[in-house]
Amino acid sequence: MNDPVDVLIIGAGASGAAVAWSLAETKMHILCLEQGGWMNPADYPSTGRDWEAKFYGEWATSPNVRGRPEDYPINDDNSPIKVVNFNAIGGSTVMYTAHWPRLHPSDFKVKTLDGVADDWPIDYDALTPFFEENDRMMGVSGLSGDPRSPLTHPPMPPQPLGRSGAIIGKAVNKLGWHWWPSDTTVATMDYEG
C-alpha cells in the first residue's frame, strides 16, 4: 500500500479501535496496523470444557507463555505487574471478559483521601460526558442505582445473575455486605450504540 494516510494507528485493541471509530466520519485517511491476524471466535477457550487449561498454553495472557508466531517476549521480571496482552486483530480485547467498571470520584483524589501518589489534575465530573459516550458506543448493560458508585445509567438492562451469581448474592447478603452486579459490554437487547 502506497497511499498516503493522515492518521496511523498502531494496534486495533480497545484504545486504537476507539480512536479509529472516533475519526471514522472525518475525511481523513486512517490506517490501523495490527500485529497478528483475525481470531476465529469458535476457537476461543470459552467454547470448550477445557477452557481453564487453555489459559496455561495457547491462550495464556502472557506472550512469554503463549509463544504464538505473532508474539514477542516481554521481560516483566522486575515488575509486580505481569503483562496481559494478545497479538491479533482486536489486541487484548481478544482476552477481554466484558467486565466494564467505571472509575469512582475517589480514584481521582488518592493523595487527598489516602495520602498516596498524586491527585489527578481533573476530576470525575470533567470526564463524565466521555464515560457516558463510551458507554453508549460500547453498548454497556448494567443496573443503575448502586449507592456506592457514581450515578451511571447504562443504556441497556443488566445481564441476569445466573445460578452462581444468585448463590453468591445470597451469601453476601447474609453477611450484610454491600454488593452490586458489574456493568458489562454484553448486549441484553437489540442495540446500535
Where are the regions that the model predicts?
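Conserved redox-cofactor binding core of oxidoreductases
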Residues: 56, 62, 72-73, 99-102, ...
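N-terminal glycine-rich phosphate/pyrophosphate-binding loop and immediately adjacent elements
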Residues: 1-112, 116, 121-125, 129-132
